[in-house]
Amino acid sequence: MSWQAYVDEHLMCEIEGHHLASAAILGHDGTVWAQSADFPQFKPEEITGIMKDFDEPGHLAPTGMFVAAAKYMVIQGEPGAVIRGKKGAGGITIKKTGQALVVGIYDEPMTPGQCNMVVERLGDYLVKQGL
């Protein structure tokens, strides 16, 4: 299965009548492996900050997490594995695997729990595949 198929079929899938606003699979260096049409472009320093937070959980909490210059308040995730952010009525979930970052961005009416489920389910699958 191609990386684009993972995004299209597993991240942008319908959940209780709703979809993520955008999603992507990135390398740890920020290289885009696959993305949805509306996925925002990360800046290199944003990826650096996200990767540092996986290595040093809590690093982003004081300043917030920036994605394409949009600021997200960092909320509880799983140290070293999942970062979650909130911005207005939407948010973001980032799951780190051995080689990739699985990213989902949502807006209402999709819920944080639905976004977490979609992103983390694919991320957990990739971890089991050694990716």
From Swiss-Prot:
It is found in: Cytoplasm, Cytoskeleton. GO terms for molecular function: actin monomer binding. The modification Phosphothreonine is found at T111. Occurs in many kinds of cells as a complex with monomeric actin in a 1:1 ratio. This is Profilin-5. Keywords: Actin-binding, Allergen, Cytoplasm, Cytoskeleton, Disulfide bond, Phosphoprotein. A motif (Involved in PIP2 interaction) lies at residues 81-97. Disulfide bonds join C13-C115. Belongs to the profilin family. One of its GO terms (cellular component) is cytoskeleton. The lineage of its organism: Eukaryota, Viridiplantae, Streptophyta, Embryophyta, Tracheophyta. SMART domains: PROF (SM00392). Binds to actin and affects the structure of the cytoskeleton. At high concentrations, profilin prevents the polymerization of actin, whereas it enhances it at low concentrations. The variability of the residues taking part of IgE-binding epitopes might be responsible of the difference in cross-reactivity among olive pollen cultivars, and between distantly related pollen species, leading to a variable range of allergy reactions among atopic patients. Phosphorylated by MAP kinases. Its main location: cytoplasm. Pfam families: Profilin. It comes from Phleum pratense. It comes from the Eukaryota.
